């Protein structure tokens, strides 16, 4: 191994002068070794584990991958930058804090605190060294106490809140340092009656009023009377009063679980009180979950042809991809935050259901076509739901209307298997509007009772006089729809809610929508929302055109619309406020209709269209002023003008749109032409730019930052517009570089808080990349593909590596360090990465409100008719949409005889013992077929055993001395192992008799043929990647440097062909002689279609995106053997002594490998342990097997720092140490990672190189290419002192321990059992093979060949061309030869076929 710090540092120092070093260079080498480890020893280039014949070579033995690399290209070394950045950058400090919602503080203690300052979401404070400018720029954090749920019921609270928000923030407030509100667990008692939480809230409010008498000057008597009154009502009534802002608590008559039927079913609860009918639904955010995905067709913008894409609906963005396995490179995106509607398209043939649908946004309409009408409806519903959510802030829906406003209730059967009725309600006394609310009950009895109850309430309500016209009051306008309106839809928002002191009898909910979520980085939107009315006269026609297009959509689509920028009139701009610095910088802002808001003292006017005429409706407001009267007079004048010009509005809107946009474009070209030229020249010149804080930077480094704040904000807005990112995504740095895929593509790299993005800049290219930082495992520097360029490799979880090239080394190094810093910061962010602090507060407030309502329901009186709830949230779940679900029981009705066939070392057998123990618990009869020396170990666990020929030690010696499957390996194996392979095949055939299911390690070579002869399902299970993928290279062909997805994929194809050609002759002879099968080849066997079970953790080797469905990474199959094992006294005393001395303990063991010079290896271990100043538990294991007999003894005296053991269970031993160093076998690597300790791997052969790279990529260990004192001592010191590595290893260990690999594997077997059976029968029918010569009891001999033909039609494979040819030839052969099945004669274990 190269000295990974000193070499990198020397190279960096040669590139950077002492007078000027970049930020990345100053922070790159923050951690350093002790002085004793900085100097290389004489053996720095030696490798004491290499065979003697290869010590003279530069890199030791020649493996197969090295010969492949010499044919492709030789690339340079890379520098390990992981865990070398102790100091965080300024940009990192801004985003390291994360909201914490869990607290150890009891809930009642937090509620009783002051709701004005004490109840809040805790956000860890930034370091005290943060600059004052950053404090001034920090976004104000609103506490939960400002949410309406926690406000004291005092007059003027809203105005006080406004004053408080207007005052400057001198520093961290008291609320920023207090504990958050924890999530309450459900009580575990048998009774549903929980503790009276609401009563504690009453006490809290009483305590608040006594502590703050100036805010509520009430007498003590009044307070006591208020508390006594509140104590007389139920907690549910008080909670509903707070949620819906009733003036007094109203007795809850009845409660029902039902759904509000709009464009989608909103599951929630209906509460019938003495005066109101209320509905509440909780809609939690699920921003990181893919809502819906699948193949649909999309029509081009100019090309009417429909092209098939893979679509993914996630968060607020609908993305489509040409390749579903390449989800980081979208072909396009549709930002649904600016969506208007989603609806089915009317089919031309009325007799057929439509498969076409469309999505309308504020700038164009997208047309789609699904495979079926059902799929189209599902997509429309999902899109409508997202649009509905994006148009309404908050996470809960509240609807409330007075009972006296109800006109009638009538049944309306709309949903099958459900009771649905319609409630018609008068909106208010000021209008003639009548609203219709549809409620669906999936319990018919509850629906009938609710219907009868509401009918009875209406009959007992005095008749109302029809509402008449009234003058326009001073109130905030709300849009109206055909069914329901915005002022009846209240989605709880975390921003300030305006508390209404005077109530009218309205059908709307009293909870008013707060102001929209602001964007601190968007001066354009702030200016739009705070401008005045006077420059909106030119643009009103444009808004009317938009409204006209909206109202022309279908009714179901219009019901989900609630956006203020669409339905309310344009707000007012003054030309003086419009400056060049706040000009619209992208299409979204130029096309977006300005929003209206009430937080700046202006009331918007909404337009409502009823038939062919336009009319204005208004809602409540609290203040009157001269400014408001002037505003309404201007509105009245505008009404007269609009009434006469409405027929021409759409044409005028189009003309005004073109005119305004033409002016803006001409002004842009006139004023920005020189800037455009400068940008283009700067683009080709390359470079980099940072967007963090500039305090404390050197003058030379300030040149990397934008000159003005406006420029920085404009760049961030453009970045978000390019990639359809949320307003909270903050750009950190940008670089110009080449992205290498098929060809180098020039473009721009963007690094933000949570994502790494790339956008091509070449004309005619539209490549975009959006890569979440949590999917990045590592970043490494490489040499560039082009001369004079510098490479950067991004290692992605479950995906092939990405290659970037920079024209300057400084830019490449800066990008690498910035990415490492962002990766470190991203680990501490919450999973919902797209939520701002305000949105997070709103989410938590909604959760608290929902939780308190659930507590109040449980505390409700038993006399109330409480029905079981539908669900905790209003999310609609599809049936059986998760492949991991357990709705259907796949377990066979009868127990199976299962044989596990494997060869190799102890680590190859141990996972199958664990799997067989799980199968035993399921009632099956497992058997392990392997080498005879493992029989006592297998039978000790109660598992049947069958012997297989072969000596694992001899095979291991061959692998170590020649490398895995190199030319020398194949040459010696051909000369010495031909007889061994024949014996292996024959013994495996005997061992697998009388089996119903076969699970085999593919290294055994015989299983797929045996399953074909026995006509039984066949699975493969292995400890290393064996299936074709672009994400990882074949475990036996790991290159020294990253070579990309194409190389990775070809290693599997090449290995399959080389491996098969080496054994094909012997296997085909064995098939014909013993199995009675015809000769075969790779096309007929289709090994890449076999169900595969990988027994390693998906946290260690994430499933690649291009794995097929039948390939599953189940998790480690661990075998716990420490329960009945007692450690020797000497070992226990050694561990205790090391802990008392304060020394780190490491485990060093190279089991299952063979070395030619055990003495030199032992000496290297001793000197490395002493130099690193650690304590060592040494396990020799198989290190000297087949070597000199004297090597079984200790060659040199071991110092007291080292304690040698013969063997110990890994699960016990690794829990006692601080780091582990071993050969990197799959089982040992899994055990050390499961224990959560840093792992040092010195690979010798096979998959050990693969797992060594994985450990390095995950940042949980070190992979050593060579083993000597210099390298090993540094690795031991790093593994025991690097905090980043230690923390990562602990986190990975927790994830692995939470997995149950055996249970997952058994469920996967059950699910794919039928598929595996069909696949085996297909291969058998091709070989013209009837049932096995020794058929199992589950198979009947009288089954004819017609079953085989039917089986062939059950499965359709999509893959390579050669794979597609096989099913076709199979069907042709089966049809033509169904009546010509050869007869069979059984002689012992050999089947002789007569020619047909």
From Swiss-Prot:
Organism: Emericella nidulans (strain FGSC A4 / ATCC 38163 / CBS 112.46 / NRRL 194 / M139)
Name by which UniProt lists this protein: Sterol 3-beta-glucosyltransferase
Localization per record: Cytoplasm; Preautophagosomal structure membrane
Family membership: Belongs to the glycosyltransferase 28 family.
Annotated GRAM domain residues: 238-273, 717-783
Keyword terms, alphabetized: Autophagy, Cytoplasm, Glycosyltransferase, Lipid biosynthesis, Lipid metabolism, Membrane, Protein transport, Repeat, Steroid biosynthesis, Steroid metabolism, Sterol biosynthesis, Sterol metabolism, Transferase, Transport
UniProt EC number: 2.4.1.-, 2.4.1.173
Written domain comment of the UniProt record: The GRAM and PH domains are required for the localization of ATG26 to the preautophagosomal structure (PAS) and are involved in autophagy.
